[in-house]
Amino acid sequence: MPEARVPQFARRSVSRRGFLAGAGAAGLGVLATACGASAGNPATASGSGTGPWSFTDDRDTKVSVNGRPNRVVAYIGSAAALRDFGVDSALVGVFGPTKLNSGKADPMAGALDVDKLTVVGNTWGEFNIEKYATLRPDLLVTNMMQPNVLWYVPTSSEKQILQLAPSVAFTSAGVSLPSAIERYSQLAGALGADQNAPSVTDAKARFDKASAALRAATTANPGIKVLAASADASEFYVADQSVYPDLSYYQSLGVEFVQPGNVVGGFFESLSWENADKYPADLVYLDSRAAAMQPKDLAGKPSWAALSEVKAGQVVPWMSEARFSYAGCAPNIEALAAAIQRAKKVN
């Protein structure tokens, strides 16, 4: 997606219009192009810590090096997913929203101890190449919102960055949640993490149990309309569930999402606050990232407070940029299942 539009997608200091517009631009590319590995075109990985190592990513790019990478620098969401799958000491650096203004870890960091990692960039457009070089990286890992566009790697310096180490990139929009999770499991395994370790298998069991609970909740309490949305001071954004891996997965389990009728760029419909009630719903699944306004921030907006689902207290946090691991997704599914189970029809 063009950088003129993309920076706002992730930068905390700008409006949510730009934040989501970047995603919309990404959606067009994702929906128009089938890229890289999928269920019918699986990744390949080979090698050990001492011999030749290779891995094929979602660009259908095969990385081949002399030994297993043991110094990995990754986008924060990618690093968090790899950590959940057992990659630990090999992670030496991260980029993307890692720390909040308070100095605490951003929720995107998951189980990572961010104080033990070198942060080469914390905001959109920030990537310290000199600091990256001092890490002596063997591999860079990130996502792609659009085919062949590396998430949080500035295009202005991408060539220099990629000269320092090979890269692996995974598609993170317009794909199924299980397949996106599996890609990170494949890479973690290729990096030497045991995918049969109890921490991994237990997380998978929890994910499966949570998924079953969500299906049971939608069956037991049918007809609950869920509005997946994000908010800023000027607009309310209604998400198209079909391009979000987590939302489309939840839909397959029976969640009834409100479908916006005027989707811009493939990701969302933006509404003025005066029209925030355009789509009646029973539950709001609200973007919980640091860049988005939260219920406490929205309390002073009459149009927000007037929504029936808000009056009923039926607002659930949504980490709209999923962490592609079983451990990262299971708690979100559990929370949504519980919310739907207890929700009441208000529209």
Whereabouts are the PLM-identified features?
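Extracytoplasmic ligand-binding site segments that recognize negatively charged/polar headgroups
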Residues: 98-103, 146-156, 169-187, 223-247, ...
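Alpha-helical, coiled-coil/dimerization segments enriched in small aliphatic residues
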Residues: 240-267
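Bacterial lipoprotein signal-peptidase II cleavage site
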Residues: 35-45
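A short, structured surface patch at a secondary-structure boundary
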Residues: 75-131, 135, 145-150
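N-terminal secretory signal peptides
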Residues: 1-14, 23-33
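Extracytoplasmic low-complexity, Pro/Thr/Ser/Ala/Gly-rich segments
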Residues: 43-88, 97-100, 340-347
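Extracytoplasmic substrate-binding proteins
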Residues: 159-232, 322, 326-347
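Structured C-terminal subdomain patch of bacterial secreted/periplasmic proteins
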Residues: 163, 179-180, 275-347
